Amino acid sequence: MSTPLSLQALAKKILATQHISKNHYFILKYCGLWWHGAPIMFSTNEDNQLMIKSAIFKDGLELNLALMKAVQENNYDLIELFTEWGADINSSLVTVNTEHTWNFCRELGAKILNEMDIVQIFYKIHRIKTSSNIILCHKLLSNNPLFQNIEELKIIICCFLEKISINFILNEITLNEMLARLWYSMAVRYHLTEAIQYFYQRYRHFKDWRLICGLSFNNVSDLHEIYHIKKVDMNIDEMMYLACMRDSNFLTIFYCFVLGANINRAMVTSVKNFYTNNLFFCIDLGANAFEESLELAKQKNHDILVEILSFKDFYNSNVSLLSLKTTDPEKINALLKNYRSKNIMRYKKLCPKIIRWARFII
């Protein structure tokens, strides 16, 4: 059970949730609601997670991460304040750098961290989808000795990275590189422009990684920037393969298609991965590798795909999709914003058993 807030801490918490005129900033300074020359704001995000905002963290930090930053700065007032607001005081020991601050945090209840504690802290702080949070996670956790030799943490990060079509061998890179690639991929996945630019400037040798993440996470805007503007080169059919590694990646599949990637290969890849939405999208774009796809579906015992492919004579390409030959991200987004495959509609009419398979198809 959490400790009740003191009246003073509660008053500060309420004040930090209000919009305060610049004329009254002196009140915030007096109350200690001031950080890096600007007010501290307290809020919750869409997942009901506690967030701290300030001038240099304008889109928000997870509360425990804010505590870790305050500890690194040896800011005792904020350490106490963030702890009273609900931050886990144990997380303070991740960034403590002086004996006095160590003792201060211990007096507030911080306990010596074991490996499981460190893994739990990582879970708490790393999922917040803001540029401020991702960049600060990278700064505070990179080269942090507490994180270096925890096998479970490495396994967690490896499992995430393996879901992307990585172009490196996980066992041959350091934990710091794993973490950097993790943060970078999250920035691309959630369209966090500030974080993307931060990692691009810091890790220019990761250009291919940014391209891979753009393809994997259906971020056509960033894909266009890194491929067309930054001139990162990759075989177009390899790019299409990467785009097909997640279902419903319509934006990046279309982008690769316009560049000239083989749509029949994409169709076969979709069958191989059992991605029905990608399969229908490829058919909409004119793919006709039905015989090869049907044989593959039979080999893999994908009965639903065998059934879908058996109606090949009833499917047609989508003229409205084929009429737009552009790699402009805005136009692609507009084209596919409300996309629904007409061939799926045809299949539903032809196949009375569709209800059994509805969960597989958009």
UniProtKB/Swiss-Prot annotation:
What biological-process GO terms show up in the record?
taxis
Alphabetical list of InterPro entries matching this protein: ASFV_MGF360
* Covalent S-S links between cysteines: none
Task: Name the source's superkingdom.
Answer: Viruses
- Give the protein's function: Plays a role in virus cell tropism, and may be required for efficient virus replication in macrophages.
Tell me the protein family, please: Belongs to the asfivirus MGF 360 family.
| Name this polypeptide is given | Protein MGF 360-2L
